[in-house]
Amino acid sequence: IRDRAGLVGAQRTELMEGIFGLRAHTSGKVWIKGQEVHIKQPRDAIQHSVALLTEDRRATGIMGVLSVADNISIASLDALRKGPIMLDDKKILELVATNKEKMAIKVPSPKTAIKSLSGGNQQKVLIARWLANNPDVLILDEPTRGIDVGAKYEIYCIIAELAKQGKSIIMISSEMSEIIGMSNRVMVMCDGRITGFIDGKDATQENIMALATQFETAPEAAAANQ
């Protein structure tokens, strides 16, 4: 599990969106399993077995008017087709049932609108959406934001289990306890630049914050330069 730490404005999300193909980039390379890959759009990322759980699940994650089944299956429609146009409803229901049990999603029916679920269950549905594609790299941007303590623990367990299965987890978190408790290695950013790496066993609030504020200008120094 690799964490991307930094203060608001460090551009951690922008970096991950660039890797996933949501943002254009003019420099840098992406390597997966020792091979350079070229990602210009999300479809390229998905083909290279990369998934992205976005920061704001309501704005860019869930499709609120659609059902839980639709939200889980939307990223893997090619595998769920029955012919060139039709979808295989049986496969979709099997996919939903498997993930409902695996992720402990509390939902009365696959046809339930996702907007009626709790924040924690919505987040688990979104994780299930990407796991249906069996990604090798899973980018999680603020995976426990806005959910209760019980749901946080469940998602921590899911993340830990995915790491045990050999998935590469890249996590962005603004919670210091989450960064220190979950990460094997922490990359710290400040003002769009990487300021350092810290092994998980050595990560403390003090050394993370020192790197996260490395390029910040003191108010008095900024005033003197005006």
Located regions from the model:
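Glycine-rich phosphate-binding loops of nucleotide-dependent enzymes
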Residues: 1-226
